[in-house]
């Protein structure tokens, strides 16, 4: 029996396994109830009395080494498995969720699509602008309140440079390098020096449109406005134009639509008037055309501008404008079905 034990000791010392399945086969072969070591234990009762001490010590040594070898191989495979699940420090600590389109992007694209079908092309310009394109070229007087630091963000090191207060500056840039017919729509971010509240923000988004050609009339403007209102808010939408003032248009007007919440009957949202203001518009002032190199005696045009937040607010009844810039996924997910 001593010879048999020594043979098994050599085998156990040389045990190898390529994977956990092979290791389980070896465990069964040597350490299970029907394994080789247990068979020797069963034969131990037949050993002569004078050899029992020596054989017993050898059997215990064999069993211990076999168990240690199997455990060592098992630990090796366990470490390999754990290595496959090591902590990835590049992964986010928060669950990664699929994004959705921002409500402002949804409405912006709707507005662009409506005007694109009318033949308008997209024009864009810089958000950091000069005084000429934001004010002077658009007929703003030297003492106009918009030029004051209370309303506009100026660049401290360059007094004539500022964050644009409207996308009308894009219209000026297009007119000074183009000749009519001009038919453009100008979406973009603008900045105003205003206190942040549920009704106002220091930055927001605008879309402005400009059409310049021969014999453009206020009637053309009104038809475009009516079509836009019906496309954006529904076929039953009514519009009304109220006289107003803007430096770059004459005559100027503000456009209201019949309240899309109460159907024009009156509610808290429309202050019980049945009407809600959505944009400003008018015929391009001849001084603006001339300042930008277009002969006002030959050409005329109209312009209109609206806040994207305002239109989104009306479409989806968002009461707090700050929610558009807070990036709260709970709020944004409410618009998944909107596109």
Curated annotation (Swiss-Prot):
Matching Pfam families, A to Z? Phe_tRNA-synt_N, tRNA-synt_2d
Q: Give the enzyme's EC designation.
A: 6.1.1.20
Q: Which reaction does it catalyse?
A: tRNA(Phe) + L-phenylalanine + ATP = L-phenylalanyl-tRNA(Phe) + AMP + diphosphate + H(+)
Similarity section: Belongs to the class-II aminoacyl-tRNA synthetase family. Phe-tRNA synthetase alpha subunit type 1 subfamily.
The EC category is ligase
- Protein name, UniProt field: Phenylalanine--tRNA ligase alpha subunit
Localization per Swiss-Prot or TrEMBL? Cytoplasm
Q: Cytoplasm: present as a keyword of the record?
A: yes
Q: Which GO terms describe its biological process?
A: phenylalanyl-tRNA aminoacylation
Cofactor: binding details: Binds 2 magnesium ions per tetramer.
The alphabetized UniProt keywords are: Aminoacyl-tRNA synthetase, ATP-binding, Cytoplasm, Ligase, Magnesium, Metal-binding, Nucleotide-binding, Protein biosynthesis
Q: Name one GO molecular function term.
A: magnesium ion binding
Obligatory cofactor(s): Mg(2+)
Cross-referenced InterPro entries: aa-tRNA-synth_II, aa-tRNA-synth_II/BPL/LPL, Phe-tRNA-synth_IIc_asu, Phe-tRNA_ligase_II_N, Phe_tRNA_ligase_alpha1_bac, Phenylalanyl-tRNA_Synthase, tRNA-bd_arm
Q: Which SUPFAM superfamilies match?
A: Class II aaRS and biotin synthetases, tRNA-binding arm
Residues in the signal sequence: none
What's the subunit arrangement here? Answer: Tetramer of two alpha and two beta subunits.
Q: Which organism is it from?
A: Bacteroides fragilis (strain ATCC 25285 / DSM 2151 / CCUG 4856 / JCM 11019 / LMG 10263 / NCTC 9343 / Onslow / VPI 2553 / EN-2)
One GO cellular component this record assigns the protein to is: cytoplasm
Q: Where does Mg(2+) bind?
A: 250
């Amino acid at each position: 029996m001593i010879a048999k034990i020594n043979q098994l000791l050599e085998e156990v010392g040389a045990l190898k396994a390529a994977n956990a399945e092979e290791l389980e086969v070896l465990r069964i072969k040597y350490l299970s109830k029907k394994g080789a070591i247990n068979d020797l234990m069963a034969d131990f009762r037949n050993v002569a009395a004078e050899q029992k001490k020596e054989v017993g010590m050898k059997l215990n040594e064999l069993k211990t080494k076999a168990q240690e070898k199997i455990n060592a191989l098992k630990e090796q495979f366990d470490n390999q498995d754990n290595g496959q699940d090591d902590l990835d420090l590049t992964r986010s600590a928060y669950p990664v969720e699929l994004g959705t389109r921002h409500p402002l992007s949804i409405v912006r694209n709707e507005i662009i699509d409506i005007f694109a079908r009318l033949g308008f092309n997209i024009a864009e310009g810089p958000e950091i602008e000069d005084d000429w394109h934001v004010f002077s070229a658009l007929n703003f007087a030297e003492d106009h309140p918009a030029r004051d630091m209370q309303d506009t963000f100026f660049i401290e090191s360059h007094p004539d440079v500022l964050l644009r207060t409207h996308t009308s500056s894009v219209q000026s840039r297009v007119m000074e390098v183009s000749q009519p017919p001009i038919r453009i729509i100008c979406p973009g971010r603008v900045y105003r020096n205003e206190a942040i509240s549920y009704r106002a923000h220091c930055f927001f988004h605008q879309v402005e449109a400009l059409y310049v050609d021969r014999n453009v009339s206020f009637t053309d403007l009104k038809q475009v406005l009516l079509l836009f209102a019906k496309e954006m808010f529904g076929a039953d939408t009514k519009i009304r134009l109220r006289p107003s003032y803007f430096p770059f248009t004459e005559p100027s007007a503000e456009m209201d639509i019949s309240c899309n919440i109460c159907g024009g009957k009156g509610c808290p949202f429309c202050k019980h008037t049945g009407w809600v203001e959505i944009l400003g518009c008018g015929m391009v002032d001849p001084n603006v055309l001339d300042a930008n190199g277009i002969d006002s005696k030959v050409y005329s045009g109209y312009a209109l501008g609206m806040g994207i937040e305002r239109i989104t607010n009306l479409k989806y009844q968002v009461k707090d404008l700050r929610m558009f810039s807070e990036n709260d996924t709970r709020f944004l997910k409410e618009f998944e079905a909107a596109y």
